[in-house]
């Protein structure tokens, strides 16, 4: 619905019923089921223990993850290893085909850290962040990472880490 609204300047008709909601936008009709019940207070599930914070260009981070992910296939799965230093994030991926390495500049505060992620989940979160820069908040090598806008609270994406083997 949001994508249709972005491309439309016409009126939107909204028709709620007991179990469904209907949106009419230009020549499109979208019908959705309404959910009912108690939902998890997601804010209480978000990690609050932040030991490391990385502020980085969203586009640069996406491109770097894509580059090191070139060796990953459905058959050759391997995590993207992120080594967060003083002012750089080094990304690695090692498969039986070889090793890919990239390094990007970032604004980093807190502890240095090494953590691994599934490349697809990491890319999904970064691509959904429609801001020029993101803040990555990390609590440790086995704690979830929060992806937030540089300023404000327009979104919060949680990316779970992958346990890394010791070799690098």
Give residue ranges: language-model regions.
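DNA polymerase processivity clamps
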Residues: 1-35, 50-168
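Specificity-determining recognition surfaces
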Residues: 41-42
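Short hinge/gating elements
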Residues: 45-49
């Amino acid at each position: 619905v949001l994508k249709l609204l972005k491309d439309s300047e016409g009126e939107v008709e909204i028709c709620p019923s007991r179990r469904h909601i209907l949106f009419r936008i230009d020549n499109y009709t979208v019908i959705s089921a309404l959910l009912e019940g108690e939902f998890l207070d997601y804010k209480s599930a978000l990690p609050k223990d932040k030991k490391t914070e990385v502020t980085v260009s969203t586009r640069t981070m996406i491109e770097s993850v894509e580059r090191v992910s070139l060796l990953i296939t459905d058959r050759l799965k391997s995590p993207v290893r992120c080594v967060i230093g003083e002012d750089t994030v080094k990304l690695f991926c090692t498969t039986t085909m070889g090793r890919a390495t990239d390094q990007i500049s970032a604004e980093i505060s807190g502890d240095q850290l090494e953590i691994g992620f599934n490349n697809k989940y990491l890319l999904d979160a970064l691509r959904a962040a429609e801001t020029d820069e993101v803040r990555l908040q990390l609590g440790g090598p086995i704690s979830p990472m929060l992806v937030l806008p540089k300023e404000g609270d327009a979104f919060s994406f949680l990316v779970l880490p992958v346990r890394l083997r010791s070799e690098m």
